[in-house]
Amino acid sequence: MGIPAGDPEKGKKIFVQKCAQCHTIESGGKHKVGPNLYGVYGRKTGQAPGYSYTDANKGKGITWNKETLFEYLENPKKYIPGTKMVFAGLKKPQERADLIAYIEQASK
């Protein structure tokens, strides 16, 4: 099963509803409870400058892209056991695809 095409406008709504309480996604934005996600696309796990990651995040050693984000956002604690991200995940594949499309667009 492939990853569906995402709609960044729908993804922005999901980000505002489910992510923005803990994350920013703007160039030079401050970290909140979670790291600023600007530039996350193409970056290795646990690498946002100035954010205190768990050893689990730093040690995962993958690069964030459509495939890795799609799997992670379904169940973050399963994908990176020991992460401090408390969000349970997005079970619907289309919601994950929309959110990823927004993250990719907003973090360039």
Curated annotation (Swiss-Prot):
PTM statement from Swiss-Prot or TrEMBL: Binds 1 heme c group covalently per subunit.
Main localization of the protein described in the UniProt heading: mitochondrion
Organism domain of life: Eukaryota
Keywords annotated in UniProt: Electron transport, Heme, Iron, Metal-binding, Mitochondrion, Respiratory chain, Transport
Underlying gene: cytC
GO cellular component: mitochondrial intermembrane space
InterPro entries noted in UniProt: Cyt_c-like_dom, Cyt_c-like_dom_sf, Cyt_c_1A/1B
Official protein name in the record: Cytochrome c
Annotated positions binding heme c: C19, C22, H23, M85
Lineage: Eukaryota, Metazoa, Ecdysozoa, Arthropoda, Hexapoda
